[in-house]
Amino acid sequence: GSSGLIAFPRL
């Protein structure tokens, strides 16, 4: 959620 990346949406 913080990173905004599709691969790591929860980071």
From Swiss-Prot:
Positions bearing Leucine amide: L11
Subcellular location as annotated: Secreted
GO CC terms: extracellular region
GO biological process, one term: neuropeptide signaling pathway
InterPro entries in UniProt: Periviscerokinin
Pfam families xrefs: Periviscerokin
Alphabetized UniProt keyword annotations: Amidation, Neuropeptide, Secreted
Domain of life, per lineage: Eukaryota
Function noted in UniProt: Mediates visceral muscle contractile activity (myotropic activity).
UniProt record similarity statement: Belongs to the periviscerokinin family.
Protein name (Swiss-Prot/TrEMBL): Periviscerokinin-2
Source organism per UniProt: Paramantis sacra (Praying mantis)
Highest classification ranks of the organism: Eukaryota, Metazoa, Ecdysozoa, Arthropoda, Hexapoda
